[in-house]
Amino acid sequence: MAAPRIGYLLPTRERVMTGAHATGPLLALAERAERLGFDSIWIGDSVTARPRHDPMTLMAAVAARTTRAEIGTAVLLPALRNPVLLAHQWATLDRISEGRVILGIGSASDVPNIRDEFAACGVPWEARLGRMMEAMRLCRALWSGEKVTWEGRWQVKDAVLGPTPHRPGGPPIWVAGASVKAIARVGQHFDGWFPNGADPALYARTLAAMRDAARAAGRDSAAITGAAYLTLAIDEDAARADARMDAFLESYYGQRPDVMRKRQVCFAGPAAAARDWLAAYAAAGAQHICLRFAGEHERQMDIVAGFRGEL
């Protein structure tokens, strides 16, 4: 079994929460992650619910400052955006990065501030899943470089996108979510599964179900990436690690940490235990792991870089 690829989530949300809006430190972290051998750099998305830097704009800067690491969204809400503009942005990003971008997407969690975000963007909440699916179909059609006419939520007549993406067909699309319907959609239509709420045992079962759905759809299930989005607070003092994780989750989401720990997979504790926890995901089939650190980014990056060869 090949070792998993390891990614690093840039702290765009944390920077805004603390009033440190400058982009220079974020770009320095991206460069540092690549120097340490991280395989990918990830950027979150939210307009008003959990404000942060615009992901596509920042991705372009990261692409210009790196040469090897993949760069992706964890995760973008395509339902909030016009898919013709989105296809144009991602084709350009794929060109800037020379084929290193990954389009991680989700339909959005059902919480009040995200519903408010959809209202602020003029998008009906109930339409989010249909908009996401149609937007991705339209993006792929435009990425082909062929003339596109489309009749649906959006109307397109004889449109040709240029430039086309660096990779024929466009960047891979990874989808969050772990419901039965969500994993069926991944298996039938997309290039990767990118959940954030499954322990290793549940992850293995759900990944197998996704691959079954792919085979049933006549697809090569091995061509679909099993990924995971995990949150870490590494500290040799387990109580201190727990306290830091709780403070991080409460400030990030504005909700009680015990509630968030039930929704998202987190680990707080010593480095050796963190290594074993990540290794359990690798054993469960995770091929690409995106790590979100609860503070102390440089120190935790160094720790993970030190033990990743043991995963």
Sequence positions of predicted segments:
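N-terminal small/glycine-rich loop or linker at the start of catalytic domains
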Residues: 1-18, 110-116, 151-171, 238-265
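Hydrophobic faces of well-ordered beta-strands that scaffold small-molecule active sites
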Residues: 6-10, 41-43, 70-74, 101-105, ...
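Active-site mouth loops of central-metabolism enzymes
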Residues: 8-24, 76-83, 167-178, 232-233, ...
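Conserved, mostly hydrophobic/aromatic
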Residues: 33, 37, 45, 62, ...
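Flexible, glycine-rich active-site loops centered on histidine and acidic residues
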Residues: 5-21, 79-149, 201-202, 251
